[in-house]
Amino acid sequence: MILFENVSKAYKVHRHMKPVFNNLNFRIDRGDAIGICGANGAGKSTLMRMLAGVEPQTGGRIIRTMSTSWPIGFTSAFQMGLTGADNARFIARIYDRDEDEVLAQVEDFAELGDYLYQPVRTYSTGMQARLAFGVSLTVDFECYLVDEVTGAGDVRFRSKSENALMERRERAALVMISHDPGTLQQYCTKGAVLYGGALTFFDSISEACEVHYGLQTLAR
């Protein structure tokens, strides 16, 4: 379970606090597959970092009783001066996994070749996403957070990523951000719309996408 109780978030901008969220109240349980819709700048990535526990809230309370991945695609989790392999080994130590086993899994899945042994700062955005996705799959989380990662790589790699994500969705919670409604509808059953600092949930991902695009149309 991940529970948000009256959670707010604000950033200090030029001596003033700029609110991002106000009084968010929701719960995510194991087995949920939730797609989050929102315009650029609405705070989707901030929300994902808060779900992961890497971004503190300004007010309210967040309770976590299940293990949660870092946001897949959130490459700031890596040490850019280290190689991809060293980052994988570091993650293995954090989660008490066998380092050689984790490295072998990442090498096989991410398909980075010799680049796996080069500093992450030399990677393209797509290569960083491959590494993030590959490393995340070496840990059995109870909730996976996905931020626009499945578009990385060629058709074959995307297909492999999709299959891996679908397999984990069967036994864990999934929270996904994507600008593509087709992707959200492929993976998610429920939806939420982030708009004006509020997060509104819908029983259907299709309904959430429809409301989101309706709001976007009105804003134009």
Question: Where are each of the predicted segments found?
Answer:
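ABC-family P-loop ATPase nucleotide-binding domains
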Residues: 10, 14, 67, 72-159, ...
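Conserved catalytic loops of ABC-family nucleotide-binding domains
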Residues: 164-176
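ABC ATPase nucleotide-binding domain signature region
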Residues: 30-35, 39-93
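Conserved catalytic Walker-motif region of ABC-type ATPase nucleotide-binding domains
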Residues: 4-7
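Conserved A-loop
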Residues: 9, 23-28, 62
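Conserved structural motif at the start of ABC-family nucleotide-binding domains
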Residues: 2, 19-23
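Conserved beta-strand-loop-alpha-helix hinge in the C-terminal portion
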Residues: 198-220
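Conserved H-loop
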Residues: 180-187
